[in-house]
Amino acid sequence: MIKKAITAMLIFCISLTAEAQKVYDIKKFGAKGDGKTNDAAAIQKAIDACSKTGGQVLIPAPFTFLAGPFNVKSNVDLHIEGGAKILASPDEKLYTESAFRENKGEGTIWIGGKNVENFSISGSGKIDGNGISFMGAEEEDAYILKPFNILDPRPHVFTIIGGKNIRIKDVHIGNSAYWTIHLVGCNDVVISGITLLNSLKVRNSDGIDLDHSKNVRISDCYIESGDDCICLKNRREFEEFGACENITVTNCTMTSSSCAIKIGSENMDAIRQVVFNNCIIKKSNRGVGIQNRDEGTVSDVIFSNMIIEGQLTTDTWWGKAEPIYVTAYSRASGNHKDANWRFPKGATEGKVGAISNIYFTNIQCFGENGVYVSGETKDKIKNIVFEDVNVSIDKTSNFPGGVYDRRPSKLDGFVKGSTSGFYFDTAESIKVQNCSVTWGKNKPDYFKYAVESKNVAILKVNNLDGEAAFPEKYEAVKK
């Protein structure tokens, strides 16, 4: 009798759950799934209906749904079954909404949403940005970008502006022509277990961009991108959303032709209270980059338990194989080639905020360059701490070394200098504690010191394990 009662109760609960979770199959709203027909209207109808009641919009397998732009809405779980795909239409004329409001020169929106709450993407299917369709000719290191007049039609894959309670889990997303996941002014976000694969030859193909967003948790993701894999920033077009803060990134593996983990360069507010932990960066042009170029500040950031592998590539991509890169320079101004009309003129032009309270601990660095820290003036770099950071440098490619990359800034983009384990230039306070520097077999003459310092007010080096690349010629620590 008791067993029957329990069974009846379970059946009742399951039926309630099934009733509560309404499913809206896009095929029932007219989607063809033949990979040729534009199914955006059918997908939009399903989303609109689901948003009114709450529930799931089903992208069923084994179909490919070609689609132009459409918008997601609140109270919807966009579920993409394994074997199903949403594919961006290659028709550039369909993409008319700028990704950055009045700034029309940096891409458009494919899958978008504004003021969206309680939205999720789930399932093991694919969202494919069809990025190569929007590219010009393929060269050895990158695709050429097609010329445009006013609106750059390259679509960002997924953009939410002003979102709350956003969940993106398990999906395969990528092949983007521009940024892949752009979250603007979002609060309470979880991105977990996704596979994000972009071409390593597509410029601007960022993985995840957190823009003025708060309380975001990213974990257990695999990301390959031509541009930054994960980037935190504060774009000027969305200044009403305030600081980017309270961000954690854990257990992710990344590869980038540019910078795997980036903070900046666009930053007109504050980026603070950020933790990156248990991450692996493989074969990237730059590993971790804090690249401040605007008046906003960066503070209270921890990088821990990481393996970083850097390698040189062509000048198309920002970076010179620095495993760790911390810089604060004013952005290029006027008609300088690195300036753009999207940046302000007047009171804030030419100003750069400080980087302070940054901690690097238990990090293994391998590659063709060392750690680089530099500020425009001493007060822009404060309290940078390296503890148990081990740097191993070897020349493994044919690309020229002995160069640091300061783009985009009003300074010369490339500056020649010695390659040292830790290279510090113009800062207020830096500490190196229990760190090591080792050199490989291939040592060009520009490989020099374990630690090199210029114009640093307070530098503390304690318990350093390592020597110069050529100890018979140079001391271990050069001040």
Predicted regions and their residues:
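Bacterial Sec-dependent N-terminal signal peptides
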Residues: M1-V23
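Extracellular/periplasmic carbohydrate-active domains that bind, remodel
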Residues: T17-K479
